[in-house]
């Protein structure tokens, strides 16, 4: 440009260090701008196998390049010199973080038996700082997921029990209840600790997981730090009141895991389920929402149903792939049945109905029932 008498005209030139590759253009929404203005922490987390993300205290955003047809110039306000010219900017999109990576990380060191505690304690689980460094997610989302995974804190390290070990400890607790003629809402914690050969805090952890009142002491990192007993309505710290529904689901999972390769007929499953429970507990299939569904036993007799166990945690994390696998399990779904298997993959800002219609289409059966089938 050349100067003239117009005061609005500016002379800009290229700086001596052009192009300065230290600069990037970032398109930020008001929330991110407020974080910057208020000196809040923003963290960019990279990965060798995945794209980088930007994390606030409670949200996670992908960082992707958005190209433009025109060059954008970054000009120093003080010198009017061009620092860099770019034809792209970085766009932020809020996402559901891939927290299955956190589950895989914790279960890579899951406690599978009592002997694991005889090893170096530093080899058990992970510290919160280690988790934060490795997982591409905000701290709050990580904390919430740690609670969902029923982690416990042992000497400032986050630990999970393998499903087999957790089931084994609860099985021993229920066996002690039978031997001692204890009611399930009146389990003496000290007797469990005395009679079961397992670390005390593991026994207390399992009692809390399956009790009516789960009141963990939260360390701020999302785990459960065992301080005392389960507790009942009388606040007796030595008494744990087991939740009948949780015990029902535990027994159902045992049956479903054993029969995972061959679906059980509904009537057989319900009979076997009842046989594993005390007489005062009456199971209902609705308890298994998000765990199992009913599918036709055969194409020739669609009215006869079988029970299909679905482990939501091992389904694909990519929505399209998850829907594809679910429709391979059953060609028709009700929204109520499919919701627990897809809700963890719904992008922020999307409604359940909007998300479902992206990958499926609604139909009405001959009996007037509203269902969804695959769109692909």
From Swiss-Prot:
The keyword Nucleus is assigned to this record: yes
Stretch list, region Disordered: 213-232
GO biological process: DNA replication; maintenance of mitotic sister chromatid cohesion; regulation of DNA replication
UniProt KW keywords: Cell cycle, DNA replication, DNA-binding, Nucleus
GO cellular component, one term: Ctf18 RFC-like complex
GO molecular function: DNA binding
Biased segments, Gly residues type: 219-232
Signal peptide: none
Compartments it resides in: Nucleus
Keyword Nucleus set for record: yes
Function: Loads PCNA onto primed templates regulating velocity, spacing and restart activity of replication forks. May couple DNA replication to sister chromatid cohesion.
Family listed: Belongs to the DCC1 family.
Entry protein name: Probable sister chromatid cohesion protein DCC1
């Amino acid at each position: 440009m050349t100067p003239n008498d117009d005061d609005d005209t500016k002379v800009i030139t290229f700086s001596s260090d052009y192009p300065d590759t230290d600069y990037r253009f970032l398109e930020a929404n008001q929330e991110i701008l407020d974080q910057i203005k208020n000196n809040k922490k923003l963290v960019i987390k990279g990965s060798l196998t995945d794209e980088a993300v930007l994390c606030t205290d409670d949200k996670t955003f992908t960082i992707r390049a958005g190209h433009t047809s025109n060059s954008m110039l970054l000009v120093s306000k003080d010198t009017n010199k061009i620092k860099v010219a770019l034809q792209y900017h970085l766009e932020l999109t809020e996402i559901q973080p891939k927290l299955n990576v956190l589950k895989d990380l914790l279960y890579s060191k899951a406690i599978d038996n009592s002997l694991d505690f005889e090893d170096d304690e530093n080899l058990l689980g992970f510290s919160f700082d280690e988790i934060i460094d490795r997982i591409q997610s905000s701290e709050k989302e990580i904390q919430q997921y740690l609670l969902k995974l029923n982690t416990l804190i042992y000497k400032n390290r986050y630990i999970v029990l393998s499903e087999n070990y957790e089931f084994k400890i609860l099985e021993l607790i229920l066996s002690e209840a039978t031997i001692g003629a204890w009611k399930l809402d009146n389990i003496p914690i000290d007797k469990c600790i005395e009679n079961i050969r397992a670390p005390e805090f593991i026994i207390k952890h399992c009692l809390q997981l399956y009790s009516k009142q789960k009141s963990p002491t939260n360390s701020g990192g999302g785990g459960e730090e065992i301080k005392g007993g389960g507790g009942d309505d009388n606040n007796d710290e030595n008494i744990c009141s087991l939740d009948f529904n949780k015990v029902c689901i535990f027994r159902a999972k045992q049956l479903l895991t054993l029969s995972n390769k061959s679906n059980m007929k509904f009537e057989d499953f319900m009979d076997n389920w009842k046989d594993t429970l005390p007489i005062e507990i009456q199971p209902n299939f609705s308890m298994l929402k998000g765990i199992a569904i009913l599918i036709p036993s055969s194409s020739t007799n669609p009215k006869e149903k079988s029970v299909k166990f679905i482990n939501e945690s091992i389904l694909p994390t990519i929505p399209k792939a998850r829907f594809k696998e679910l429709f391979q399990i059953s060609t028709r779904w009700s929204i109520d049945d499919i919701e627990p298997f897809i809700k963890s993959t719904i992008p922020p800002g999307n409604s359940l109905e909007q998300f479902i219609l992206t990958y499926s289409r609604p139909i009405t059966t001959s009996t007037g029932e509203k269902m969804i089938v695959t769109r692909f």
